[in-house]
A protein has these predicted regions:
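A Zn2+-metalloprotease active-site environment signal
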Residues: 6-17, 23-24, 28-188
């Protein structure tokens, strides 16, 4: 994916190096989503219970490798692309002004408007603070544990979380959660 010359979003709260320091695993909803994506793309079933990686506390860092810097830049450029597209779409279809989410980059764990976010949860969107949260080491886990490597797979994850933000802005996210709760209650 060629992103040279593309702008980086400024709607980013970079909390990497501020604590947490855990290795990411693909457990929880993130693991299920990625397992489903791999199945759709390859036809191979993946057991989500095997996607959980070990948690390992570490020290906070303020310096990042070249690869980590490039990955953060990539994520900011993908977010900027979603901002441009959704701003134009909202304008074109009379949906009002598009309010961009903030992307929070973190390592290990961080506080969100929805409680404590942990790497093992995978990337997530919190409607309470209109932020999407991602520990960039999730992409390393995607590559290592699922073979899902490359810019398009990484961009998909970010765009997916932005999609939840759009659902929230349009008022459909809450409705979807209500439907899921009804379905879960029916199964109980």
């Amino acid at each position: 994916m060629k992103l040279d010359g593309r702008r980086e979003s400024t709607n980013v709260d970079d909390r990497r190096g501020m604590g947490g320091g855990a290795k990411v695993g693909l457990g929880g909803i993130g693991g299920l989503l990625i397992a489903g994506l791999i199945y759709l793309l390859t036809g191979q079933a993946v057991d989500p219970s095997q996607l959980t990686g070990p948690m390992d506390s570490g020290q906070a860092r303020t310096e990042f490798t070249q690869e980590e810097q490039e990955l953060a830049s990539f994520a900011k450029k993908i977010l900027a692309g979603t901002e441009d597209i959704w701003t134009a779409y909202f304008s074109q279809y009379g949906l009002g002004n598009y309010v961009s989410p903030t992307m929070v980059l973190y390592t290990g764990s961080t506080q969100s408007g929805c409680g404590t976010g942990q790497s093992s949860m995978g990337p997530f969107y919190c409607s309470a603070d209109q932020c999407l949260y991602i520990d960039l080491s999730f992409f390393t886990s995607m590559k290592r544990q699922l073979g899902a490597d490359g810019d398009f797979a990484y961009a998909y994850v970010i765009a997916h979380e932005v999609g939840h933000h759009v659902q929230n802005l349009l008022g459909t996210l809450g409705k979807a959660h209500q439907q899921m709760a009804k379905m879960n209650a029916a199964d109980a």
